[in-house]
């Protein structure tokens, strides 16, 4: 599952609108829409805040 799909699925699982998720994480609704649309360039600090508000985490793994 890609990041955009995971964020949208978790937000919906929590019964939150994009505006609700934005307010919980301190970002704009436009930012939430951009993440869920898979936009290539988003600010990492804002992304981490959004993920945290949704109970998700960003992980980095070694390539194999």
Where are the predicted features?
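Recognition helix of helix-turn-helix/homeodomain-like DNA-binding domains
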Residues: 26-40
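Residue-level signal for the short linker/turn that defines the boundary of a DNA-recognition helix
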Residues: 5, 15-16, 42
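Conserved hydrophobic/aromatic packing and binding residues within compact polymer-binding modules
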Residues: 7, 21-22, 32-35
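Short alpha-helical DNA-recognition segment
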Residues: 16-30
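Short glycine-/small-residue-rich flexible loop motifs, especially phosphate/cofactor-binding loops
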Residues: 8, 19, 48
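DNA major-groove recognition helix of helix-turn-helix/homeodomain DNA-binding modules
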Residues: 45-61
């Amino acid at each position: 599952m890609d990041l955009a799909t995971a964020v949208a699925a978790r937000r919906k699982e929590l019964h939150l609108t994009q505006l609700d998720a934005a307010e919980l994480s301190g970002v704009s609704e436009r930012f939430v829409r951009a993440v869920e649309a898979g936009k290539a360039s988003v600010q990492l600090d804002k992304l981490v805040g959004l993920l945290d508000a949704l109970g998700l985490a960003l992980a980095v793994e070694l390539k194999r």
